[in-house]
Amino acid sequence: MAGHSKWANIKHKKAKEDAKRGKIFTKLIREITVAARLGGGDKDANPRLRAAIATALANNMSKDTIERAVVKGAGGDESANVEEVRYEGYGPGGVAIIVDCMTDNRNRTVGEVRHTFTKSGGNLGTDGSVAYMFTKRGIISFAPGVDEDALMEVALEAGAEDIITHEDGSIDVYTDPHDFSDIQEVLIEKGFNSENAEVTFDAETKAELDTETAEKVMALIDKLEDLDDVQSVYSNANFTQELIEQIG
């Protein structure tokens, strides 16, 4: 299990998301709508929808907005008929990157993604070129100061796969993707509110970067996340607290 803290990355990511909350909401609504269209509007029977709603609530989306997105997807609204596509590539320094998209026009999306990679010193790869480096898992992250023993007891009893305590005191709870929402709900019921919770692609081996390369990789990821069709971007870059502070 990779033992790299997500805490520094979370703080940096939240600062960026606060500056572009409207676009984040658009992506979250799209995920809820597609999840409801593919698996139905009952979140108890649809793990993907349950996870999407949990993420939306964590980002302070109103329940009314969430409900409208669920109804839109479950009702078969034609505008909800987008397809999911995944692109893989390499960033500066050979950093592995996965880009998950939802689109109604593959040609437009792949063109935008390829252009962004190329202009940022990377290159778009073929299917499977980097995916083997990642494992899909749920990660529930807690800030320094949480009661480690109590959290560990509750998380393990709820079915967590692993719990990592980092040098800065932050804690990551790892789950099977299918158990993610159930474990998150148990933790919340027991009073453990996380700083971040997501089903993500986690790299077993992280790429260590110097400051210059890290800045270029972070810029590429930011540009990819700004594309309208892009839902999520994953990389194996190890953005340490020191690197993030140096980059600013």
Swiss-Prot record:
- Gene3D superfamilies hit by this protein: 1.10.10.200, 3.30.70.980
Which keywords does UniProt give here? Cytoplasm, DNA-binding, Transcription, Transcription regulation
Q: Where is the signal peptide?
A: none
Q: Which domain of life is it from?
A: Bacteria
One MF annotation (Gene Ontology) recorded for this entry: DNA binding
Q: Does the record carry DNA damage as a key word?
A: no
**InterPro entries from the xrefs?**
Integrase-like_N, TACO1_YebC-like_2nd/3rd_dom, TACO1_YebC_N, Transcrip_reg_TACO1-like, Transcrip_reg_TACO1-like_dom3, YebC-like
Compartment(s) where it occurs, according to its Swiss-Prot or TrEMBL record: Cytoplasm
Gene Ontology CC terms, in alphabetical order? cytosol
GO annotations under biological process?
A: regulation of DNA-templated transcription
Keyword Nucleus attached: no
HAMAP family linked: Transcrip_reg_TACO1 (MF_00693)
Which family does the similarity line name? Belongs to the TACO1 family.
* Name of this chain's protein: Probable transcriptional regulatory protein FTW_1073
